[in-house]
Every structure is written in structure tokens, then in C-alpha cells.
Amino acid sequence: MHRLLLVSCFLLLNSWAWALKPTREWIATPDSLGLRYQTTALSTPDHAQLAGWIVEPAATVPDRHTTVVVAYGDANNMSHFLSQARALSQGGYRVYLFDYRGFGHSSDFAIDRQRLYYPEFSTDLRTVLADARHRYPRSRTGIIGFSMGTIMGSEVAATSKCDFLVAEGYVASPQLLVAAIFQRSQKVVTLPAEAAEYALVARRVRCPWLLVGGTADKSMPLADSVAVARAARWRQRRQVLCFEGGHLEGFYRLTEAEYGDKYVREVTRFLAGKRS
């Protein structure tokens, strides 16, 4: 099953929708990878119902007492990120996966498949982050966002209590992204009105922030992540982790003995205050 999920991850890396493309059916559950987990069912302030999984740290490694909430991208559902969750679990992390409204087994939500994202997804992430903090008050709790999920991740980190943010394939400008999509493929992708304020978000992120990017990522250039890190002001700790590869290939490229093991070690180094 783990091999099948790795194949799914590889296909996912090469099939980004660049607009919303949710799927309802889970391709696996955590127990199929031998992961210890529990299910969650949350209600957001605006009454959406969210399905989630909390994957516990592997029993064979020291517990880092750190909870990582996963904000994935624009396609599929949380089951497609079980391989990343497994790698983090094997590194001693608790991993909180969830489905946005309209994705997976969460409640229905009318989605325009030409839309890049909805602000309601930030409400979903904020709800899950708050639940994680409530369940594990003595745990360090933060967010790892991928692609579109970096929009929600940075917005929530800027406005909520968040101990750290990891952003791979960081979206620096939704407006430039949709313009690039149109230039490349003549595909029209729309933005919510709230996107007009997104340029102000990065400067408000106060927690430690690790930006992960590929040298060959043409969609979210590594230079954008470098610029955000260099713009850090006093007491804003930001660092860039780069790898040789394309969009969202970080776990795949930063692998030595096991899938994503080097990636997880670099996250651990960052959270410990060490530089790569």
C-alpha cells in the first residue's frame, strides 16, 4: 500500500490542476500504512463539517511533542498526503490531516473549478489548528502547507497563534500565478476578492517560517521564497530549504534511506533553531 501511495504522490506531482479539483474518495486510510491514528469530526464557525485524521508519532522513535497540521493544495484530498504524514510520523511528529469543505469526506461546498482557492479554506485550517492546540496544549503546534495550501497557511499563521510554518511551493502572488497560467495554457483561473489583500500577509507572519522550494519550479519560483525570507524583519526567523527538482517534489527529492527522511530532518533542524 505504501508503494501504491508513493506512485500516487508521483502522479500528483505531475498533474497539478492550477484550479480546484477536489475528489471525494479516499485512496487509503492511515491504518493501511500501519500508522496509529484517530478520526476527528469538526464544525467550523460557519457550520461546515470537516473530516480529519490525527496520525501519532511512530512508536519506535522519540516523541517530539510537536503537532503538524497539513494544508494541502488544490486537488484530491487528504489521503493523497499519507506518505508525507508517514515520513513525519517516523520523524517523531504528530500529524493532523484534514479535508477542506468540498473535499474528501468533509461537508458539501459549491466549488467553481476555475477558482484558485476560497477564503473559507482558511477558516477550515484555522478551525483545525485551534482543535490541535486544544487537544495537545503542551505540544508545539504549527502548519505545513503545500502549493495552494501555502496561501491558507500563511494567512492563518499571520492571524492565529501558530508556533511555526513550513511552506513548500509558496504562492507569493495569486495574481501573478493566474496570469502565468493564462499565458501558458490560455486557461482562465479566477480569484476571490480577498486575494487583493494577500500581498500584506507575509510581513504579518511572526512565527518561525521555513520556505521549501525546487530549483526547477517554474510555477512558484524559488526566488519568491528567497525574497520572502530576505524581507524578514527584526525577530522574524525565516529560512529557505532548496532542492534540485520541480514543483512539490521536496519529499521525493530529499530522500535517503526512506521516503522524505532528509526533508523531515531538515524540518527538525529548523525547529531546533539550526541552519542547514
Spell out what each predicted region is.
Residues 84, 207, 221-231:
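Short alpha-helix in the alpha/beta-hydrolase fold that links the catalytic acid
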Residues 151-195, 201:
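Hydrolase active-site cap/lid region
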Residues 88-108:
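Conserved alpha/beta-hydrolase
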Residues 13-43, 48-58:
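An N-terminal hydrophobic leader/cap segment in hydrolases
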Residues 74-87, 100, 223:
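The serine-hydrolase catalytic nucleophile loop
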Residues 205, 211-213, 217:
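Short beta-strand/loop motif that positions the catalytic acidic residue
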Residues 236-276:
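C-terminal catalytic histidine-bearing segment of alpha/beta-hydrolase fold enzymes
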Residues 114-135:
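Alpha/beta-hydrolase active-site loop
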